[in-house]
């Protein structure tokens, strides 16, 4: 860490948020005048009261935040397709921080770059992760699966109607054409039901999202993240939590369903 930071002119600080907090005292001493301190997330700087990450005045500070997982960023980079990303300049010491940041965004394969701030990036990112991208998505899936199972549907049927059809068919069409296209091109029965139930789901979960956003912007989610992820027993505790999901009937059914996809057939 020390050698890379001392020799580099663009220091990409890409440790986990808890890791950035732990290593900051070392890294901060290695930054040279005119360097760029580059983040892929606004967490450390935004929640400086909790992380202690306050960049020195003699460096540029910026971020490029890909809108996808690291796996997706790498996979898309290798196949030349790239992934959307936001960018922000928090501190422009050299007068060239904007140009340097955009160049870095292009270099990592971002096909579309849109401006933000460190604060807006972290509040939208944490809300999205805990919300529709992972937390809410898995929660809603689990709720529907459980209702179907409670009413006598088999694990395979419940999983296919809840997850497989969404991930293998519908979400791809939404990605290609938009949700409005999906509504216009599904069966009339699905169309009528979706139009009627969409506002009910929206109104039911809006208070949850409002609570979530407040928890993010107040710094409470940052506190929980740093506390949990900085625990010496973090890995063991995480494995225990993840094993509950992995061993659940729903996701065991999912493993069986995925194994039956044609691309997974063994010769």
List PLM regions with ranges.
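A generic structural-conservation signal
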Residues: 1-2, 114, 157, 183
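Rossmann-fold NAD(P) dinucleotide-binding segment
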Residues: 1-53
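Proline- and acidic/polar-enriched loop/turn elements at helix boundaries
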Residues: 2-3, 66, 117, 160
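A broad, structural surface signal
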Residues: 3-6, 25, 29, 142, ...
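Catalytic cores of large soluble enzymes that bind and process phosphate-bearing ligands
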Residues: 15, 19, 93, 136, ...
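Rossmann-fold dinucleotide-binding core
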Residues: 38-130
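Active-site-proximal catalytic alpha-helix in oxidoreductases
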Residues: 95-150, 156-174
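NAD(P)-dependent Rossmann-like dehydrogenase/reductase catalytic/cofactor-binding core
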Residues: 150-267
């Amino acid at each position: 860490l020390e050698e890379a930071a001392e020799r580099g002119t663009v220091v990409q600080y890409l440790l986990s948020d808890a890791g950035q907090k732990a290593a900051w005292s070392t890294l901060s001493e290695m930054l040279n005048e005119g360097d760029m301190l580059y983040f892929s997330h606004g967490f450390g700087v935004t929640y400086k009261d909790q992380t202690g990450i306050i960049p020195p005045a003699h460096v540029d500070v910026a971020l490029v935040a890909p809108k996808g997982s690291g796996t997706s960023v790498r996979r898309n980079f290798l196949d030349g397709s790239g992934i959307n990303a936001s960018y922000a300049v928090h501190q422009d010491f050299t007068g060239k921080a904007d140009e340097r940041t955009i160049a870095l965004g292009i270099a990592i394969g971002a096909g579309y770059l849109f401006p933000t701030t460190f604060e807006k990036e972290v509040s939208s990112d944490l809300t999205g992760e805990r919300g529709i991208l992972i937390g809410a998505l898995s929660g809603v899936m689990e709720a529907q699966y459980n209702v179907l199972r409670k009413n006598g549907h088999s694990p395979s049927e419940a999983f296919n109607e809840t997850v497989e059809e969404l991930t293998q068919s519908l979400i791809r069409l939404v990605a290609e054409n938009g949700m409005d296209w999906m509504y216009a091109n599904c069966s009339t029965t699905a169309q009528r039901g979706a139009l009627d139930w969409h506002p009910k789901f929206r109104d039911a979960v809006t208070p949850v999202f409002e609570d979530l956003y407040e928890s993010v912007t107040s710094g409470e989610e940052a506190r929980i993240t740093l506390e949990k992820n900085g625990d010496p027993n973090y890995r063991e505790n995480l494995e225990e939590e993840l094993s509950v999901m992995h061993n659940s009937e729903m996701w065991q059914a999912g493993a069986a369903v995925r194994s039956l996809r044609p691309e997974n057939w063994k010769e």
